[in-house]
Structures are given as structure tokens and as C-alpha cells.
Amino acid sequence: MEVTNGLNLKDTELRLGLPGAQEEQQLELSCVRSNNKRKNNDSTEESAPPPAKTQIVGWPPVRSNRKNNNNKNVSYVKVSMDGAPYLRKIDLKMYKNYPELLKALENMFKFTVGEYSEREGYKGSGFVPTYEDKDGDWMLVGDVPWDMFSSSCQKLRIMKGSEAPTAL
């Protein structure tokens, strides 16, 4: 232990390394550049393969993991209802036809749709289900065959019956 003028300088000395390490390493510092690559004293003639990477728990983030592992058989669309303060998402691939979809929407938002006729639209209800297709046009749910609807639907909106005829 080095003591100078009664001071213990060894304890307050700043050095690189882990705390409590007693080994002192001599570092070579030079300002001379060489064209040679650094020499690795630890390497042997035979280079060992790098160790296998282990996956850290919680990595990758859940969001990107969900995107990568996303099931390709789903088709989520946003559903809004006039007067409801929130939006929902539903998977159109879960339903096989319009009656199943409308029943699910009725249960989700607690309303009734009524009967659909091609000439008059939806009768007997204060609400009309509409959807936005890939072209950005708003159409009545049930106007096109189910397969075409499920592939082109971008958003669903349950409009008040009084607003639907003027908007479409």
C-alpha cells in the first residue's frame, strides 16, 4: 500500500476495471499508426466458431413479434356507430355471411338492424350498416355478394337511419 505524506492514495486512485480487482494491467499507448491489423493475443491458430446467440427474454418487442407472426387468415376492420363514444375491431373472416355479421354487430352495440330489401334498404330500424370499400365509396352492407364485401371492406359504420339516405 502506497502512502504519501500520510495520505492513502491507493484507495482514491481512479483506474479502469472492476472494483476490487487487484491486478494491474500495463497498457501500451502509442501514437504510431501501422498498416497491420490488431493482433489478438487470445486467438489461436484454429478459430473457434462464435457462441450461439441466445434470445433475450422479452425481445423482440411484442408489437413487431405480432406483426411477424400475424395470422394471414384474419381481416380486421374498424366498426363505428353513430352516437357510440368508441370504435371496435372485428375479424370479417370469422363470419360466413351477412346475417352472422349483423347478429354480431347487434350484440356488440346493443341495437337492431331490421329487415333488408334490395329496393328499400333496411326497414324497421333506426340504424343502417354501411361500409367503406377500397375505392373510398360508402355502400350499404348487403349490396354486393359476401365474398366481394369481405375482400373490399375497409371500415364499417352503423349510421343513424335518418342520415344514411342522404349520405349514400
UniProtKB/Swiss-Prot annotation:
It comes from the Eukaryota. One of its GO terms (cellular component) is nucleus. Preferentially expressed in stems, leaves and flowers. Phosphorylated by phytochrome A in vitro. The keyword Transcription applies. Gene3D superfamilies: Phosphatidylinositol 3-kinase Catalytic Subunit, Chain A, domain 1. Residues 74-161 form the PB1 domain. InterPro entries: AUX/IAA_dom, AUX_IAA, PB1-like. Residues 23-34 have a biased composition (Polar residues). Pfam families: AUX_IAA. Residues 1-74 are annotated as: Disordered. Homodimers and heterodimers. Interacts with the auxin-responsive protein IAA2. Interacts with TPL. The N-terminal half of the protein contains two conserved domains I and II. Domain I includes a slightly degenerated ERF-associated amphiphilic repression (EAR) motif which seems to be involved in the activity of transcriptional repression. Domain II is required for the correct degradation of the protein through the SCF-mediated ubiquitin-proteasome pathway. Interactions between Aux/IAA proteins and auxin response factors (ARFs) occur through their C-terminal dimerization domains III and IV. Aux/IAA proteins are short-lived transcriptional factors that function as repressors of early auxin response genes at low auxin concentrations. Repression is thought to result from the interaction with auxin response factors (ARFs), proteins that bind to the auxin-responsive promoter element (AuxRE). Formation of heterodimers with ARF proteins may alter their ability to modulate early auxin response genes expression. This is Auxin-responsive protein IAA1. It comes from Arabidopsis thaliana. The gene is IAA1.
